[in-house]
């Protein structure tokens, strides 16, 4: 029965497929919103109307891309599909809770869309800072609906995190230690721990904001002894781990892709890679106030957060150089997935370098809330997380579907996307250095040239998205079945065929440990 299979599913592969489809759909919405932003900024003057509607679009773009595209695809899609296969588990630890985690997302998405349809919309930015998000500056239901949307997405992620942690620790073969699980499994487990520790703090913050708006509490209102800076601390204590949540599963996927297409049987420095991810996860919790260098913190506080932020570059560097060392001396296969992985390593490193610049509290005073910050986080997200997703997708698509993509088209798609995202975001560094502020729908004529180039780049990326839809259609229409898979001894997920049967590892797995 269709309903029994897709609505009441308890199968990790089906739920993973649902997550991938939902994430792809949300990605289209998020892309459309980003194109609205770039259309508005393509030339001076107004296109959409006032700044409120512009900021509603910006806010929705952020929420859709983060909570409904990257997280569902990386953690829900790839995580559900691959983690049980990689550790030889028959399914997730809590299969019905797994289904609920997914089905909380469409209602959450619906609430977010509703928030932009009522009143004037939530034009707060994804940070939802009071007093702008208070009931004076944002009267009406919009911000409340956004808060409810975040609550649902948060519950979904917390339940998913519990599920993954339990599965990864508890459902390995008895003889297999944690240090024999693949790096993608590690990355998902560390991501789940970050989610479990950070999301409750966000929930507390937005719940207090909700009561400030509706029940006359004053958590964030100085008139009643509250402090809007408290909200910023609560939000960023979640918000900074969140950005590592978005990239860590990508690290895991890139490790697998680089190892596979270098013809290696293991990544360089496995233990170092695990240590690096754990370090990044830990450090991610003690650097949050680097988002707040302009709110008037003590000089010693700023010095600490500057130093702590820079320390994160060390484990990140360990990962980058280990990927390069994995490539070294390998029999490199120039597949589309490998191109995405190499693009990831290069562009993620560029994004990391601008992050080191922003970590300096003195420089950040000048660069805060300019397009330099936008350029920085889009290099690590739009070219880090997205390139990892694309690399993972073209690498594991034959496993998920049983069909192969057209290699040539996939490489053309990569080339168009590479040109598009770089043309979009590289000029934004220049805009930021010349002082163009974020979150404005219009700008002085002096900024016209780089904005026009940036907007042209975004439309190149759009053609890449449309080409990807065609490539996937072409694969299903042509039905080229998978013939053989290399290196299955060190890539267990391929062991059961392409696609694997509905139920895998129904009997306990026999592991021969070397």
From Swiss-Prot:
The modification N-formylmethionine is found at residue 1. O2 binds at residue 244. Pathway: Energy metabolism; oxidative phosphorylation. Its cofactor is heme; Cu cation. Pfam families: COX1. There is a cross-link at residues 240-244 (1'-histidyl-3'-tyrosine (His-Tyr)). Residues 1-11, 87-94, 171-182, 262-269, 328-335, 401-406, 479-514 are mitochondrial matrix. Component of the cytochrome c oxidase (complex IV, CIV), a multisubunit enzyme composed of 14 subunits. The complex is composed of a catalytic core of 3 subunits MT-CO1, MT-CO2 and MT-CO3, encoded in the mitochondrial DNA, and 11 supernumerary subunits COX4I1 (or COX4I2), COX5A, COX5B, COX6A2 (or COX6A1), COX6B1 (or COX6B2), COX6C, COX7A1 (or COX7A2), COX7B, COX7C, COX8B and NDUFA4, which are encoded in the nuclear genome. This is Cytochrome c oxidase subunit 1. It comes from Bos taurus (Bovine). The gene is MT-CO1.
């Amino acid at each position: 029965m269709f309903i029994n299979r897709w609505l009441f599913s308890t199968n990790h592969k089906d739920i993973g497929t649902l997550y991938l489809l939902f994430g792809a759909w949300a990605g289209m919405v998020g892309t459309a919103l980003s194109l609205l932003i770039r259309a508005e900024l393509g030339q001076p003057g107004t296109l959409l109307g006032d700044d409120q509607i512009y900021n509603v679009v910006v806010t929705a773009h952020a929420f859709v891309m983060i909570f409904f595209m990257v997280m569902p695809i990386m953690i829900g899609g790839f995580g559900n599909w691959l983690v049980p296969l990689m550790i030889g588990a028959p399914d997730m630890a809590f299969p019905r809770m797994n289904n609920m985690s997914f089905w909380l997302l469409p209602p959450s998405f619906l609430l977010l869309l509703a928030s932009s349809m009522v009143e004037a919309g939530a034009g707060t930015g994804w940070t939802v800072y009071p007093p702008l998000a208070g009931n004076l500056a944002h009267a009406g239901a919009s911000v409340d609906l956004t808060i409810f949307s975040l609550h649902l997405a948060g519950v979904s992620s917390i339940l998913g995190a519990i599920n993954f942690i339990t599965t990864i620790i508890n459902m390995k073969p008895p003889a297999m230690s944690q240090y024999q699980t693949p790096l993608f499994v590690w990355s998902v487990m560390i991501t789940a721990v970050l989610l479990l520790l950070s999301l409750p703090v966000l929930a507390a913050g937005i719940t207090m904001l909700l009561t400030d708006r509706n029940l006359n509490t004053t958590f964030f209102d100085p008139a009643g002894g509250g402090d809007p800076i408290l909200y910023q601390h609560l939000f960023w204590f979640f918000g900074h781990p969140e950005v590592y949540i978005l990239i860590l599963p990508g690290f895991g996927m890139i490790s697998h892709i680089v190892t596979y297409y270098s013809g290696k049987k293991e990544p360089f420095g496995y233990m170092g890679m695990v240590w690096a991810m754990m370090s990044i996860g830990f450090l991610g919790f003690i650097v949050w106030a680097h988002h707040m260098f302009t709110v008037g913190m003590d000089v010693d506080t700023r010095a600490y957060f500057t130093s702590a932020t820079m320390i994160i570059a060390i484990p990140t560097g360990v990962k980058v150089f280990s990927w390069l060392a994995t490539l070294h001396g390998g029999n490199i296969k120039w597949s589309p997935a490998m191109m995405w992985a190499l693009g990831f390593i290069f562009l993620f490193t560029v994004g990391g370098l601008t992050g080191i610049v922003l970590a300096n509290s003195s420089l950040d005073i000048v660069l805060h809330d300019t397009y330099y910050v936008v350029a920085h986080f889009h290099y690590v997200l739009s070219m880090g997380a997205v390139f990892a997703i694309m690399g993972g997708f073209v690498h594991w698509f034959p496993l998920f579907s049983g069909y192969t993509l057209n290699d040539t088209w996939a490489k053309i798609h990569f080339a168009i996307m590479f040109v598009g995202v770089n043309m979009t975001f590289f000029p934004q560094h220049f805009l930021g250095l010349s002082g163009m502020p974020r979150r404005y729908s219009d700008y002085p004529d002096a900024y016209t040239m780089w904005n026009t180039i940036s907007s042209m780049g975004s439309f190149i990326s759009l053609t890449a998205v449309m080409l990807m839809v065609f490539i996937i259609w072409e694969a299903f229409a042509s039905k080229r079945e998978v013939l053989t898979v290399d290196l299955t001894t060190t890539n267990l997920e391929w062991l059961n065929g392409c696609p694997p049967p509905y139920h895998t590892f129904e009997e306990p797995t026999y592991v021969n440990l070397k």
